[in-house]
Amino acid sequence: MKKKSAKNEKDRIKVFSCEQPDEMLAFLKKRPVFRELKYPYTERMLKLLKETNPFRQTYHYIESGESFAFFIIYESRMNIMTLGNSEWMMNVKTVGFPCSLSNSGYVTNDLEFLLSYCKRIKGGKLILNVDEPVEMKGLGFGETLPSCVLSIKDEYRTIDDYVASLRSQYRRRIRLAEKRCRDVSVYRVEISDAGMKNDSWDIYPLYLNTYRKSEYKLECLDRKFFEESEGTRLVFVKDDKPAGFVLLHEEGEKLVFQFCGMDYECMSNTADLYFFMLLHIVGFAIEKNKKIIDFGQTSELTKMKFGAELSKRYFYAHHTNPFLNMFAILGKKLLEYRYDFPDFKVFRRG
């Protein structure tokens, strides 16, 4: 643990940094605005990620006048041009949530204050999954992977109501996936508060399969995360073996699609299985009276064919080396995620 203060032009910046999430959360609870940090910034989630994410994670709080920020930094050696489909490996400190969710890795009332402080941190930095960006000089800026969000309409009482609301070509695609997955059984597994798994299916190899095929690799979580992460697991079983799974988390009126995994050799066309899995996520959300599904990032085209809309996310990049920082500012096209998806017009009119 380390405590320190630094000066800026107006006020002293109070800084509290530590290595353990429970220590940071105990500190934050003394501040009224942080007494009830919501998912995913819960003690259980942060402690589990500390154990299961191999990257070094540190926790930071800064305050100056009315401005404050809590943020997480994880350190890794990464290809900073992954989104631009090039390669340049660099040691990077990422202000981000330490698993592949669409959430940012900070809570603040003043993003400009947070960014100004991050510019002082030595080395290369990325601030990921910013949803409401501000203009800030001296940093690279661009789009990262958007989050896919599906709104669940009030008239959807059953999954059949949802499917009936789709235009014919999208209904046909879903029905085809159902037909081709008719020998796939679906099991629902609840992970209790105690983190006790109550099924015998080993889904971790499926997660590793999908991780290895991912174009945008970040962290690779340990098995323990999937055994103890609180939520609901849907397991898709074919020939008495798990063919796929999804890990879901309920947060108020929102359902969060956290992770998935597949056996890519179990079917001749795994796209059918993926459609089938997404359909069951929609059905689960309707059953649980959710208003929104956060389908997360990646696989945008498939999720858009279910009616999901894209919620933009942005990044900032900075390096204390002036030459490298100039590249971060001017090399936007090499760093950012570029996309041009069609408007599928998934739903029927009226």
Residue positions per predicted region:
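Non-catalytic accessory segments adjacent to catalytic cores
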Residues: S100-L150
